[in-house]
Amino acid sequence: MIVLSKEQIEEMVDPDQMMDQIEEAYRIYGSGEFYMPPRPTVEHENKQLMYMPCYTKDIIGTKILSIFPENSKLGLPSIDGIVLLNDYTTGAPLAVMDGQSVTAWRTGAVGGVGIRHLSRKDCRTVGIIGAGMQGFHQAVYACAARDIHTVYVFNHSDRDLTDYLERLKKAIDKEDVKVVQCKAVEELVRNSD
C-alpha cells in the first residue's frame, strides 16, 4: 500500500497531467460510469466526520473529512482529512493520501480546466480573490492553463502577504510571471483578463 504525505504529493503533482485527469473525471461523470452514494456524516459535540465514497469500474476512492471547529483555537486546521483508494475487484487498500493536499490540488485543477475551456486563449493576467489555500492552487493552475504573465491577488484581511506571494511565485515556477498584491478588489478586477 502506498502512503503519500502532503510533501510527497506536492513533489509529484504535474498541473497539466492533473487537469487532463480532471477532464477524464468529467467524461466519466457525464457517461454515468460511476456510483457515488450520498455522503454520510457522523456528528458529535460540534465535530463532524464526512465520508465521500465514489466507485468506478477500476477503483474506489473515499475522502474522509473531519470538521473540528475548535481546532482553530489550537492553531490547527479546522478541516482535515485523508483520501483512500481501494481496488474495485478485491477491496484491497491501494493508497492513503493527505486529504488537504489532494483536495487543494484537485480543486485548483478543476478551476484550471474551466480556464482551459472557457477563457480567451490570449489571457495574460488573472485575478485571485483570497490568499488562502484554494486561491493559491487556483493561481498555479491558471498559470498552467494559460500563458499568464501577472497574477493579481487581493485578500480581505490586511495581513502581510509577502511570504504567501513568494511561495506562490515559486509554486508557479515560471520566471516571467509576476505576482502582485492588490490593495482593493477594484484594482484586481480592472487589471485581470
PLM features: residue spans?
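NAD(P)-binding Rossmann-fold cofactor-contacting core
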Residues: A145-I172
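Glycine-rich Rossmann-fold phosphate-binding loop(s) that bind the pyrophosphate
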Residues: A131-G132
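Aromatic pocket-lining residues of Rossmann-like dinucleotide-binding sites
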Residues: A142
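N-terminal ligand-binding/catalytic initiation module
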Residues: M1-A104, G112, D122
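Short acidic low-complexity segments
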Residues: E175-S192
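Short helix-loop-beta connector
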Residues: L118-T125, D147, N191
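N-terminal Rossmann-fold NAD(P) dinucleotide-binding loop
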Residues: G135-F136
